[in-house]
Amino acid sequence: MTKKLHIKTWGCQMNEYDSSKMADLLDATHGYQLTDVAEEADVLLLNTCSIREKAQEKVFHQLGRWRLLKEKNPDLIIGVGGCVASQEGEHIRQRAHYVDIIFGPQTLHRLPEMINSVRGDRSPVVDISFPEIEKFDRLPEPRAEGPTAFVSIMEGCNKYCTYCVVPYTRGEEVSRPSDDILFEIAQLAAQGVREVNLLGQNVNAWRGENYDGTTGTFADLLRLVAAIDGIDRIRFTTSHPIEFTDDIIEVYRDTPELVSFLHLPVQSGSDRVLNLMGRTHTALEYKAIIRKLRAARPDIQISSDFIVGFPGETTDDFEKTMKLIADVNFDMSYSFIFSARPGTPAADMVDDVPEEEKKQRLYILQERINQQAMAWSRRMLGTTQRILVEGTSRKNIMELSGRTENNRVVNFEGTPEMIGKFVDVEITDVYPNSLRGKVVRTEDEMGLRVAETPESVIARTRKENELGVGFYQP
């Protein structure tokens, strides 16, 4: 009888990536098959996020539902991972004694041993340590699930913004070696992946070891990824302005594989608030980066993160944020009301902005961003956009859907063989969250050519050291 695994994931793209790796790992080691139905599962895993308000209570609310399943099936294994697990540790079991496994973002690779331990002597396991980059050495080979893929290039963050829990839950910055990253991407390209999204809490701080022992920069890595045959688009998230250096901007100037879209969090337009947040940059410095980017790539579109109602934020501070939004002309944003995260410096600040005022500021900010986003979309009306076709449309299974370079979802009529390929689409309608168009050119009509297959690149560039260990040498 097939053993089944159910994973519920909350939070960022890093968590989505981690959950996919958990599924691949437990399939390889235990033969667990994913199920969307928790009642069918032999193992339930909750991959948590501590960024949102009341994150801990949300976890225990979900665990309360799963407790009923465990009462019906005592052999059911329940595990809690992610950032809340890293923060709370053994405290989770004090409130939910039926939880069998507690693991952090850096110990998910040990899940097979944890499950074996629980199956063996029924003793609970808690492992929320930070074992450097070990987890990537223990994960199975990547499996493509469509033409796009996430690839983690680093873990953790050293910035210690006063509102953020990431350095405490994921540890400080650790970069994967470049050959590991490039080999994983080449394997994905061999399976039909055309677009990769490089992940990290602060990707532009990547300083990975190269095959010759030197230390690479993020700009170096972007160019190496762009050189992999079969990879036509590169995205990355998330970045910090303080390390968005000129060499990265130069990659936008000379590397067409890097898309004309950037998510660069700023959080506030007030230097006073930025200082309270520990952001180490000013609004003017942020705008200077954007000016350089648009000089290198005039059509680039920018999204950002904003926190409203941070302790001490005045009406004047908020107006400065609104001015920054207008000056930069952001395309979209992830914007939130401040809520204190336990254990962070901001949690000790006086939360002196009334709740109704926070809500009003958030509404004003989001309305302005939505207006700007719609204006950007209207400029695309009547233009021809190159779309990477990802699959069927969520709105209509008889239609296809894909994304433009600037991250717009486009729905259109097409045929199944277009999935995983590029098509040129004329934009005919504009909606708040998507565009609509008609195909004017298929990939076969574009004259695109792959000079060398990903399989041959892997075979040609694979080397072995004196111990017989293979590595990828560009």
Curated annotation (Swiss-Prot):
Residues 378-441 form the TRAM domain. [4Fe-4S] cluster 2 binds at C157, C161, C164. Binds 2 [4Fe-4S] clusters. One cluster is coordinated with 3 cysteines and an exchangeable S-adenosyl-L-methionine. One of its GO terms (cellular component) is cytosol. Residues 143-375 form the Radical SAM core domain. PANTHER family: CDK5 REGULATORY SUBUNIT-ASSOCIATED PROTEIN 1, MITOCHONDRIAL TRNA METHYLTHIOTRANSFERASE CDK5RAP1. Catalyzes the methylthiolation of N6-(dimethylallyl)adenosine (i(6)A), leading to the formation of 2-methylthio-N6-(dimethylallyl)adenosine (ms(2)i(6)A) at position 37 in tRNAs that read codons beginning with uridine. This is tRNA-2-methylthio-N(6)-dimethylallyladenosine synthase. The lineage of its organism: Bacteria, Pseudomonadati, Pseudomonadota, Gammaproteobacteria, Enterobacterales. The gene is miaB.
